A protein has these predicted regions:
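N-proximal low-complexity "stem/linker" segments adjacent to membrane-targeting elements
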Residues: 2-4
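Short catalytic/ligand-binding loop motif for oxyanion handling, primarily in non-cytosolic enzymes
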Residues: 19-20, 36, 52-55, 100-103, ...
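Short His-centered aromatic/hydrophobic patch
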Residues: 157-161
């Protein structure tokens, strides 16, 4: 049976979208051309808004209009554009630093899932905050873009660093 990927929406979340740190950057950037071809306009990469993300070009394309409005209404700090790599995939850079009360977020993970992370350092807390904010953005996108009406939605969270988004 042949599956029509053009009806599926894929959100791919990585700390290394427009942010070269290690090996996942190579994985995500090297498959973006093929993913963009398979999923078309339904392929979105989400990365951290670090203020000076390399290879990111902020755009004012019509495809961002509705999502820009709903993320603003929900006080989700996002920048929308393209990653300047082959395929020029759509990218949402997600602000997270001022989004959460660190203690409350970590308590909710402990309370809901038994994840004991109150003593976690910033190298743990920062990715949890980022990926949780990405979960909120994906939820907003699904509601705004009427994605569920067109086909299935997939969210791929790379590495442990993005696990908080799975739990959102």
């Amino acid at each position: 049976m042949q599956y029509d990927m053009s009806r599926t929406t894929l959100f791919e979340v990585s700390w290394e979208v427009c942010n070269k740190v290690g090996g996942i950057y190579a994985v995500v950037s090297s498959k973006a051309l093929e993913a963009a071809a398979l999923f078309g306009d339904n392929y979105y990469l989400l990365g951290p808004d670090l203020g000076n993300n390399a290879e990111f070009e902020e755009t004012d394309e019509a495809c961002w209009q509705e999502l820009r409005a709903i993320t603003a209404r929900r006080n989700l700090a996002c920048r929308f554009g393209r990653w300047d790599i082959p395929g020029r995939p759509k990218v949402i850079l997600v602000g997270y630093r001022d989004r959460f009360n660190q203690g409350q977020l970590l308590f909710s993970l402990w309370n809901r899932y038994g994840i004991d992370s109150i003593s976690g350092g910033w190298d743990y807390v920062e990715p949890v905050m980022f990926s949780t904010a990405c979960g909120e953005v994906i939820e907003a996108a699904c509601q705004t873009l009427a994605v569920p009406a067109s086909g299935p939605v997939l969210a791929h969270f790379h590495e442990w660093m993005c696990g908080g988004g799975l739990l959102y």
